[in-house]
Amino acid sequence: MDINDPSFSSTENGIYELLSRGYAAIEAATERDLKLPELGDIIGQVHAPEYISQVLSGWKPFYLRSVVNIPDRIFEQYNRTECFTQMGLFAEIQRAWITVDNRLFLWDYLSGQNFQAYEDLSHTIVNVKLVRPKANVFVSEIQHLLVIATSQEMLLLGVTIDEKTGELSFFSTGIQISVQGINVNCIVSSEDGRIFFSGNKDPNLYEFSYQLEEGWFSRRCSKINITGSVFDNFIPSFFSFGTHGDGIKQIAVDDSRSLLYVLRETSSVSCYELTKNGVNRCVFYSFSSMISQAQMLNATSPLLDPRTTQIVSIVPIPAYESQQIYCVAITSTGCRFYMRGGRGPISHYAPSNSTLSSTPPSTLQLTFVRFPPPMQVENYASSRNYPANPFFLQNQSTSQQQPERSSAVKTTPMKCSSLSNIYTSDLFFAISSSNTNEGDVVCCTAPEVGRIANAWQSGTQPSLIESSMYVPIKGFVQDIKCIQNSRERNELVSQFNTPPPTFAILTNTGVYVVVHRRPIDVLASAIRMGPSLSSGIDGQVQLFFESVGRAEGCATCLGIVSGCLDQGDFSHAAANFSGSTTKLAQADLLDIVKKYYIEFGGKAFIDQSRYNNQYDSSSLEFVRLSGCHDGLASSISRIIRNVWKNHVIIAKKMQNKRIHYAPAFNATEILKIQSGLLYLSTFLENNKSFIEGLNSPNTLIGSSNVADEIAVQAEHRALSALLLVLQQIVEGISFLLFLNDTGVSDFHEIVSSTSIDIQKSCSNMTFGEFFTSKRGREVTKELVNSLVNRHLQSGGNIDMVSQLLRKKCGSFCSADDVLIFKAVESLKKAKDTVDIEERQSLIELSYTLFKKAAHVFTPEDLRLAVEEYKSLNAYTTAVNLALHVASARDDRNQALSYLVDGMPENDPRREPFESRTKCYSYIFEILDSLESQMSNDSSAIKVDVYDTIQRSKDELFHYCFYDWYSFKGLTDRLIEIDSPYIQSYLERNSTKDMKIADLLWQYYAKREQYYQASIVLYDLATTHLAFSLEQRIEYLTRAKGFGSCHVPNSLRHKMNKVMLSVLEQLDVASIQDDVLIAIRGDMRIPTSKREELSKQLDGEIIPLSDLFNNYADPLGYGEICLSIFQCADYRGINEILNCWESIIKTTHENAIISPVGSSPVEAVSSTLKNLTLRFSQSENVFPIEQIIDITERYAFDQQGEAVATGWVIDTFLGAGVSHELIFIVLNQLYDRREKPWQGKDRLFFLIKEVTHLLKLWHEVSVRAGVAQTSKPSFDAPLVLEAIEKYKNALGAPDTATKSCKENLISLDSEIRQTY
């Protein structure tokens, strides 16, 4: 048994569906961000909307973070009018610079410190540029090159930075070229280190080429004239001094497309392709063509007058920001000319999905003109007096397409300089000179990305919505640089993982640090200023949500929660707001955004456009989720964006052809990501009860609005999935960091110790897959195993590893795998040791460790462990482990309730039930094994195992154990078990198992619980189980017997009620048994039909009505019909009399056709006697008057010599009917003389019957030897009166009546003598 066996798995099967759903939501959010329209789509409309000029300071797109004055020493140098000076910024090394003749001074522009100078030059410095060095030319410490151009030469200085002190060091590279005759005015470089430059009034473009060493046909460094002829490279520059031509004003490089743009004095633009071997011009765009196209697009405007307008700057637009727009030209009037690139005739509004290959463009064409906001001199001039309070700058609303405005505020056209530029995310800085001597004017514009995205997502064609403002500065702008940049074109994404774009504006008075407010900063700023406004915080937040949409508003709130806020803005705002109501602490701000995330996130709803209003299980897929969900998905995707699709581990092939594994992540970066996600996870966990969809999926169950109920369930499912993914990513990052810094073994050793398959998965797996896929968990498990192996080999404490894993990433990677590993190691040692005590100690240790990890055991894990314990004869330990694992796999005890509820189909509790029963099956295998062994040792072990089982408090196990007993044919043993669970087991199974049902009443009877036994027997007799009728009668008979047994007084009343039911059912069952016997012996019925009817009757007890209607009556079983009437207390006299008549008739007919036996009259007499004996006590089925009447009529019809007179009277007297009752009935028949008792013959027949009765009655009443109490009462006066009546009726005797009259006279005399 090996921990590396794949059967030992710590995966939780229930989470993968949620993880997959959460992964899909993050992917969808990422896709939404990627599909945000690019610049080329946004400017597709010719007319852009007006600029938004925010009056409230918190909504302004930029704020002034700080101002750092120029050091006094530098300021003095700059103000020397006799010197040639220039100033600029090196943002890459956080330095400002100034040249004074042949000297170069640098200082840290953020602190005003770290002053340094370079004074080793002989000639006046005319230009300076900081560039990247070419690869593999200089030592690795040199990360930057300083290109210094003087009037005579251009040289390269290596620059290094001390990481601790920040000090700069300069190193001479010995690389320089002559630029005599070229007054260098522009130097640029590409990312790969190529350096290009131009000279003032010089039409040529040059490249400063250098390499590591000189070659056969190339020098180490040289100046290459790119745009001139081949011979120009061999002619000294001073020969061309004074050459007139179309000079170059600016050079710009687009590294993303390998293009170089040249802006000339005539405002024409040339585009060159940068190749490995040189530069090729591919496009020339004249200024006149631009202006013509601009006027076509925007009609006539003074700002487009070619006589007063020129191009002052050309700005490449990187391909990652736009695939369509290649560059933007900025005019002196502040207009921006957006140009598309193409390879042939192009449309002004080409769609963004038009694929652009890597080939250079053959055309550039202006497709959109953006006019500047108006320049308001008065307001701007006044704002210069308050440079330290940027929150209260006053800008006015502007109009885009109407440059000429009539307004109370005086506006003048801009006079933009070449320093005007467009930076990341289309942030535009226009540097314009003013008509005063106070300095330059800085106008900034920024796209309203949130509004643009909201318009696009709502299905509206987006347009370039921008806000604008003027930044108050003092002095004249010397340079402007972006010191915080991002390559992400979507600011909604970049605000989650990069600082806000920050700009340093260098003037002759100081450095102004200006920061762009992203949507996240705007929201925070608006909230902070809310208390001081009449609309309050509610109004400010609502305005923000309306502008960006619910989902983006929620995402922005979560961005603040996750720590993405610009703290500089927060601190600066706190210092500038006045009044107690505006001083919001950071904690207050977080509470506020949490509140609005919940309140303004909206609710999920069913999207009727995709849904047919049929509420079924699939309808959850038609729910449009809330802004809370979409905002959360966007937040997670943006925070994790930089690594989500990246590989976790990289495999490098070394020189020895071996593979070396290393982490593909930066620990600091993923730690920062984890921090943001941890904030989100904590927020969601702490506010679960307030967020609809996370509090409970059953909030609206039972609501009359089914649509709302479905929507809440869908929201809960989606938010729970995201929360799970969030937690898994946080813990997954902890695991990777732990793996990378274990202190035991390096990363490569851990990965390379796994299987080849796992190693391949490691090198191919992305972060997203690693965090959310099942394969990712498998890889994680193997890495943990490898880590444990390495740790054990180094003699480390495995408990420490387990504790650290459980603490850092307990649910992502199971620390319990470590415990399992140690437990398995203990078992291996136990098998190898010969010392009994040590072996037992190791077995107990392994059991303790297995118990701690039981909740991650799979059935296969348990099987392997049980097999190991069996091999060590530790059967009891194996049983205990199986019981513990079963309980751990179902910690909420769902399996038992599933069994008790009847195991409904499609119930989620079925899985834990099957998991537990699988664990129990290993115990039963142990029992089977022990039962098959015959040794004395096995007997002792068997006793211990059964004792362990008996002591178990696992109710479900006991039920399964009893099932196993039944399966083994040991059912009878169950009633011998003394367990608190056996009774409930027997009770539950008695309704579906005949044997168990039969055991249950015995169980009660054995424990003298006769009331319960009677109930069970009654239930058995009336159950649907396949008992025979005989068994049912037996059960009812036994129950009847228990009714006379002793029961507690509290149960006697209940027992009596049960007995009533038992007796009723017993009567019915007896009648049914009579019908069954009758049918089986009824030869009139065909054999097949007889068998069918017998099968129907030999089972469940049938209601009396069914017995009568379906069997007894149709088959002519009169006696049984009378039994049914009696049992049912039926009083329908007609049906009852018909039944009696039918019995007499049937008996007579059967006697006639019978070849042997008595005469018909004798047969009828016998039948009547038996029926009278049986039913005479039931008035409803034995109406004596009518029965005697029917019988006498039959007797009259059957008169003959062979038929004795008075046999009817003899029959009823023999059945116990009194003389007096018979006399009364016959006397009434005579007196009423109803049909058929009319006519002389019939009346004479009745007189003979009465005479016979009276004679017998008198004889009995005077018979000697009979006790007086036993003699029937004899009403002599009534009898004598009747005799007199009958004698008179007979009249004069004739032959027929003579004998009868003589008998009456004789009887009269005897009675008179006796009484």
Curated annotation (Swiss-Prot):
<dbReference type="GO" id="GO:0044611">
    <property type="term" value="C:nuclear pore inner ring"/>
</dbReference>
<dbReference type="GO" id="GO:0006405">
    <property type="term" value="P:RNA export from nucleus"/>
</dbReference>
<dbReference type="InterPro" id="IPR042537">
    <property type="entry name" value="Nucleoporin_Nup155_C_2"/>
</dbReference>
<dbReference type="GO" id="GO:0036228">
    <property type="term" value="P:protein localization to nuclear inner membrane"/>
</dbReference>
<keyword id="KW-0813">Transport</keyword>
<dbReference type="GO" id="GO:0005643">
    <property type="term" value="C:nuclear pore"/>
</dbReference>
<dbReference type="GO" id="GO:0017056">
    <property type="term" value="F:structural constituent of nuclear pore"/>
</dbReference>
<dbReference type="Pfam" id="PF08801">
    <property type="entry name" value="Nucleoporin_N"/>
</dbReference>
<dbReference type="InterPro" id="IPR014908">
    <property type="entry name" value="Nucleoporin_Nup133/Nup155_N"/>
</dbReference>
<dbReference type="GO" id="GO:0000972">
    <property type="term" value="P:transcription-dependent tethering of RNA polymerase II gene DNA at nuclear periphery"/>
</dbReference>
<protein>
    <recommendedName>
        <fullName>Probable nucleoporin C890.06</fullName>
    </recommendedName>
</protein>
<dbReference type="InterPro" id="IPR007187">
    <property type="entry name" value="Nucleoporin_Nup133/Nup155_C"/>
</dbReference>
<dbReference type="GO" id="GO:0000054">
    <property type="term" value="P:ribosomal subunit export from nucleus"/>
</dbReference>
<dbReference type="Pfam" id="PF03177">
    <property type="entry name" value="Nucleoporin_C"/>
</dbReference>
<keyword id="KW-0963">Cytoplasm</keyword>
<dbReference type="GO" id="GO:0006606">
    <property type="term" value="P:protein import into nucleus"/>
</dbReference>
<dbReference type="GO" id="GO:0005635">
    <property type="term" value="C:nuclear envelope"/>
</dbReference>
<comment type="similarity">
    <text>Belongs to the non-repetitive/WGA-negative nucleoporin family.</text>
</comment>
<dbReference type="InterPro" id="IPR042538">
    <property type="entry name" value="Nucleoporin_Nup155_C_3"/>
</dbReference>
<dbReference type="InterPro" id="IPR004870">
    <property type="entry name" value="Nucleoporin_Nup155"/>
</dbReference>
<dbReference type="GO" id="GO:0005737">
    <property type="term" value="C:cytoplasm"/>
</dbReference>
<keyword id="KW-0539">Nucleus</keyword>
<dbReference type="InterPro" id="IPR042533">
    <property type="entry name" value="Nucleoporin_Nup155_C_1"/>
</dbReference>
